[in-house]
Amino acid sequence: MTEDIEQKKTATEVTPQEPKHIQEEEEQDVDMTGDEEQEEEPDREKIKLLTQATSEDGTSASFQIVEEDHTLGNALRYVIMKNPDVEFCGYSIPHPSENLLNIRIQTYGETTAVDALQKGLKDLMDLCDVVESKFTEKIKSM
């Protein structure tokens, strides 16, 4: 009987391992220097135009962005509102348990809401690039 207990003990012993997320981080090769620009292919399913909330002339539209939250929503709203062709921009999270971001853009007659969204995304990316380069510059000078 003691032999059975000993076998059960050895069968259930687990060797200590690092948590899975730490193992995955070690396997990833991340370049933080910014020396190498990598172009990612755009995800066509990431942003959806909500056709029910879009005007015929395209000056007002609502979009749904998948897998995003307040972090992108507030920054994007701020950058889009800096555009003088934009009359209104607001965002909402429909429900806390859903990872969706709804954004509404209304423009003056010269610009479409799609153009304003594209310009806002580009301007936000440019802003992030400047912040990253300044940060990297300061880190290297330390």
Swiss-Prot record:
Q: Where in the cell is it found?
A: Nucleus, Nucleolus
GO cellular component assignments: nucleoplasm; nucleus; RNA polymerase I complex; RNA polymerase III complex
Per its UniProt record, what InterPro entries does this chain match?
Answer: RBP11-like, RBP11-like_dimer, RNA_pol_Rpb11_13-16kDa_CS, RNAP_AC19, Rpo11-like
Gene3D superfamilies noted in UniProt: RNA polymerase, RBP11-like subunit (3.30.1360.10)
Instruction: List the Gene Ontology MF annotations in alphabetical order.
Output: DNA binding; DNA-directed RNA polymerase activity; protein dimerization activity
Superkingdom field: Eukaryota
Q: Ranges of Acidic residues compositional bias? A: 24-42
**Which keywords fit this entry according to its UniProt record?**
DNA-directed RNA polymerase, Isopeptide bond, Nucleus, Phosphoprotein, Ribosome biogenesis, Transcription, Ubl conjugation
Q: Show the ranges annotated as biased composition (Basic and acidic residues).
A: 1-11
Summarizing the function annotation, the protein's role is: DNA-dependent RNA polymerases catalyze the transcription of DNA into RNA using the four ribonucleoside triphosphates as substrates. Common core component of RNA polymerases I and III which synthesize ribosomal RNA precursors and small RNAs, such as 5S rRNA and tRNAs, respectively.
Q: Give the miscellaneous note.
A: Present with 8680 molecules/cell in log phase SD medium.
Its family?
Answer: Belongs to the archaeal Rpo11/eukaryotic RPB11/RPC19 RNA polymerase subunit family.
State the protein's name: DNA-directed RNA polymerases I and III subunit RPAC2
Q: What is the lineage of its organism?
A: Eukaryota, Fungi, Dikarya, Ascomycota, Saccharomycotina
